[in-house]
């Protein structure tokens, strides 16, 4: 499957820089614990840590419900009319809702980030590898939750995804699409296996 695909994630970024308001402080709870309870808590934490290591799986991408009658809308003046995006060779991230059928951009929905993966079809993607990238994208969005929604933050997410795609390529999970319109091998020369001794050699 050599086609570009997109995924949307709901983002909870801070709008502090845009709105000029004060960031709400989260209330912190203080809990006092006796020494006996601390020992019980430590034992339960060790058991939980062991279970987490066994079951560590990629983050499930949260589905975003499709919307009907989406119209292209620009940002309002209260946000400075900014077009927030991060565009790299293989990853495009927009702070907007993009209708997957009509490709209408609704920039007013800045609580959604849309990922467009490999728009030039440079790689051959399977459903499993696309899912891995979308899961990693969801992890990054969750990691940057609360950070200011700026182009810098989106570029950080985009560059991390580029590195992850390079890792998938070097691990052999994806490969170059030799039927692509342009063969430029942007992530290095293709590697092939000689003599099956387990070492990859450059072409």
Swiss-Prot record:
One of its GO terms (cellular component) is chloroplast thylakoid membrane. It is an enzyme of class 7 (translocase). Its main location: plastid. Residues 1-21 form a transit peptide. It is a peripheral membrane protein. It catalyses: a plastoquinone + NADH + (n+1) H(+)(in) = a plastoquinol + NAD(+) + n H(+)(out); a plastoquinone + NADPH + (n+1) H(+)(in) = a plastoquinol + NADP(+) + n H(+)(out). It holds the Pfam family NdhM. Part of the chloroplast NDH complex, composed of a mixture of chloroplast and nucleus encoded subunits. Component of the NDH subcomplex A, at least composed of ndhH, ndhI, ndhJ, ndhK, ndhL, ndhM, ndhN and ndhO. NDH shuttles electrons from NAD(P)H:plastoquinone, via FMN and iron-sulfur (Fe-S) centers, to quinones in the photosynthetic chain and possibly in a chloroplast respiratory chain. The immediate electron acceptor for the enzyme in this species is believed to be plastoquinone. Couples the redox reaction to proton translocation, and thus conserves the redox energy in a proton gradient. This is NAD(P)H-quinone oxidoreductase subunit M, chloroplastic. It comes from Populus jackii.
């Amino acid at each position: 499957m050599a086609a570009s695909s997109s995924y949307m994630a709901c983002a909870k970024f801070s709008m502090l820089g845009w709105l000029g308001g004060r960031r709400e402080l989260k209330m912190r709870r203080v809990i006092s614990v006796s020494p006996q309870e601390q020992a019980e808590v430590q034992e339960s934490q060790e058991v939980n840590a062991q279970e987490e290591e066994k079951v560590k799986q990629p983050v499930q991408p949260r589905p975003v419900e499709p919307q009907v009658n989406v119209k292209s809308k620009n940002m309002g003046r209260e946000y400075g009319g900014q077009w927030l995006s991060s565009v790299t060779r293989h990853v495009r991230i927009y702070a907007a809702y993009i209708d997957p059928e009509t490709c209408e951009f609704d920039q007013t929905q800045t609580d959604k980030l849309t990922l467009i993966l490999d728009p030039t079809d440079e790689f051959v993607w399977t459903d499993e590898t696309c899912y891995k990238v979308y899961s990693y994208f969801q992890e990054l969005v969750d990691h940057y939750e609360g950070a200011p929604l700026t182009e810098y933050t989106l570029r950080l997410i985009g560059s991390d995804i580029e590195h992850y795609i390079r890792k998938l390529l070097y691990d052999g999970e994806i490969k170059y699409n030799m039927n692509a319109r342009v063969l430029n091998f942007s992530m290095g020369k293709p590697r092939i296996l000689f003599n099956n001794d387990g070492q990859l050699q450059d072409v």
